Amino acid sequence: MTTNTVTLQTAHIVSLGDIEEAKASIKPFIRRTPLIKSMYLSQSITKGNVFLKLENMQFTGSFKFRGASNKINHLTDEQKEKGIIAASAGNHAQGVALTAKLLGIDATIVMPETAPQAKQQATKGYGTKVILKGKNFNETRLYMEELAKENGMTIVHPYDDKFVMAGQGTIGLEILDDIWNVNTVIVPVGGGGLIAGIATALKSFNPSIHIIGVQSENVHGMAESFYKRDLTEHRVDSTIADGCDVKVPGEQTYEVVKHLVDEFILVIEEEIEHAMKDLMQRAKIITEGAGALPTAAILSGKINNKWLEDKNVVALVSGGNVDLTRVSGVIEHGLNIADTSKGVVG
């Protein structure tokens, strides 16, 4: 593959070469996740060929492990010796914690005091020190930065980092390996590291691949920034897609997104719940809210059919770390509003 004029605009931030190097760097650690065809989304909804990229089957249950492992692999021996630190309420924390365990590095994770007990325990399970501090993520982040400065630890950012973006971009290379003639790729978006990496990989190969970002109506800082062409914050309420609950996107990720992403779709909370339920019922896939965003966009009918009908489409299921109580609630709500016993399965 060669870098084309489209991706040259953002090559100073992250390039195809960075992603190919990341692929080699993280290969011993990650799982190459499956890409499966959804008969339901293909035959009954889009009249296209819709495939699901199952990052919910990645180690730690999320794509975040890719970026975290690539970033940490590139630290100097001195940085590794002093230890690493991250602020996260969920998937990034587990990605950092597992990588640190595999490489024998001391890691500290600072979580908001409101972090779900299940995610606290999962992170501690990797032998990582977990500190609960702050009533919201901003307070948590500020405390984490203080600790890093005091102790000389290296911060592993969840998205606004070249090596993190490159690690996430390896998903794009895997998609191309499986479906070289993919037409449309639909990606959940929070801070933007995932879509920035994937867009770089895909557009380097074929600039005509249509890349769609999906966010919740409640929290869509990146979509707002994309259409205003200026870094902007947006959050009016919480979202079931908590993995994408990022008020202000990254500065570096935004620069990549504004050049390489084609459009954004916004979905409401009920549409995300419906997608989670349908993925469970039809495809037998358990996903968190963020992982259901691309499917929600397809089911909502908000994507122009020209990008779906007779096209090879990939919808990314970014993670599956969801509390069982939430799964139970989604199922119960779904059963109350629809008959889920009929229709195409898969």
From Swiss-Prot:
Domain of life assignment: Bacteria
**Signal peptide start-end:** none
Q: Which cofactor does this sequence's record say it needs? A: pyridoxal 5'-phosphate
User: Which residues of the sequence carry a binding annotation for AMP?
Assistant: 59-60, 94, 125-126, 321
| PROSITE patterns per record | DEHYDRATASE_SER_THR (PS00165)
User: What Pfam families does the record point to?
Assistant: PALP (PF00291)
Q: Which residues form a coiled coil?
A: none
By what means is the activity of this protein regulated?
Each protein molecule can bind up to four molecules of AMP, which act as an allosteric activator to the enzyme.
| Parts of the chain that traverse the membrane | none
The terms under GO molecular function for this entry are:
L-serine ammonia-lyase activity; nucleotide binding; pyridoxal phosphate binding; threonine deaminase activity
Q: Quick check: keyword Nucleus in the entry?
A: no
Query: Which biological processes are named by the entry's GO terms?
Result: isoleucine biosynthetic process; L-serine catabolic process; L-threonine catabolic process to propionate
The entry sums up its family as follows: Belongs to the serine/threonine dehydratase family.
Q: What does this protein do?
A: Catalyzes the anaerobic formation of alpha-ketobutyrate and ammonia from threonine in a two-step reaction. The first step involved a dehydration of threonine and a production of enamine intermediates (aminocrotonate), which tautomerizes to its imine form (iminobutyrate). Both intermediates are unstable and short-lived. The second step is the nonenzymatic hydrolysis of the enamine/imine intermediates to form 2-ketobutyrate and free ammonia. In the low water environment of the cell, the second step is accelerated by RidA.
Q: How is the subunit organization of this protein annotated in UniProt?
A: In the native structure, TdcB is in a dimeric form, whereas in the TdcB-AMP complex, it exists in a tetrameric form (dimer of dimers).
Cited PANTHER family: L-THREONINE DEHYDRATASE CATABOLIC TDCB, THREONINE DEHYDRATASE, MITOCHONDRIAL-RELATED
What is this protein called in UniProt? L-threonine dehydratase catabolic TdcB
Organism the protein comes from: Staphylococcus aureus (strain bovine RF122 / ET3-1)
List the lineage, top down.
Bacteria, Bacillati, Bacillota, Bacilli, Bacillales
Q: Which gene encodes it?
A: tdcB
